[in-house]
Swiss-Prot record:
Provenance organism: Silene vulgaris
UniProt domain GST C-terminal: residue ranges: 91-217
GST N-terminal domain: residues covered: 2-82
An example Gene Ontology molecular-function term: glutathione binding
Protein name: Glutathione S-transferase
GO cellular component: cytoplasm
Record's function text: Conjugation of reduced glutathione to a wide number of exogenous and endogenous hydrophobic electrophiles.
Gene Ontology annotations of biological process type: glutathione metabolic process; toxin catabolic process
Location(s), subcellular: Cytoplasm
Name of encoding gene: GST
Family: Belongs to the GST superfamily. Phi family.
Length: 217
């Protein structure tokens, strides 16, 4: 049965799931949700995600929401040799590193990066004024996070594992994609290993396909 993804291609959370599907080489049907028209608050959608947020995924009788839960589900249920990039590690030392850095992305990087993306990207789309104080505060916070990333990436090619792209890196892609088009780009470029890592993961075909779907919307 075909996997169905309900979401908005401009949503960072939806993009996270799309990248995972493309990395796993899985066929899926994309069901666009018109959030401007309140599609995410309709009863039919709330049956999939009671919080009225995108995305939601249907895999036969299984229904999921929360983007990181969905990417983990896809990675663990489709971890076979012919199903694209593994995205996870099962050896305990590598698994430990991956689990730690997944939490770092969710609790250290994402809150700060999301505020910056809102101020520097999405507010402009909605005709709202950027709060420069919020931008300055969060640029300083992001710089500290990226200092930790720089140290990590001096000893590891990727954040979650030494030599392989995992969910850790994947989860960063949507916000990186937006922030690299703003003044915040300099914070990434000032750190050599962080800059190289960004260029590497943003060049992945899965991300290019995700952007292509966004342009079609």
């Amino acid at each position: 049965m075909t996997i169905k993804v309900h979401g908005n291609p401009r949503s960072t959370a939806t993009q996270r799931v799309l990248v995972a599907l493309y990395e796993k080489h899985l066929e899926f049907e994309f069901v666009p949700i018109d959030m401007g028209a309140g599609g995410h608050k309709q009863p039919s959608y709330l049956a999939l995600n009671p919080f009225g947020q995108v995305p939601a995924l249907e895999d036969g009788e299984i229904k999921l929401f929360e983007s990181r839960a969905i990417t983990k589900y896809l990675a663990y249920t489709h971890d076979h040799q012919n199903e694209g990039t593994s995205l996870i590690h099962k050896e305990k030392h590598e698994m430990a590193a991956q689990l730690v850095w997944e939490e770092v992305e969710a609790h250290q990087f994402d809150p700060v990066a999301s505020k910056l993306a809102w101020e520097l990207v999405f507010k402009g789309i909605f005709g709202m004024q950027t709060d420069t104080t919020v931008v300055e505060e969060n640029e300083a916070k992001l710089a500290k996070v990226l200092d930790v990333y720089e140290a990590r990436l001096t000893e590891s090619e990727y954040l979650g594992a030494n030599d392989s792209f995992t969910l850790v890196d994947l989860h960063h892609l949507p916000l990186l994609g937006y922030l690299m088009g703003t003044q915040v780009k300099k914070l990434f470029e000032e750190r050599a290993h962080v800059s190289a890592w960004c260029k590497k993961i943003l060049a992945r075909p899965s991300w290019e396909k995700t952007l292509a779907l966004q342009k079609q919307a």
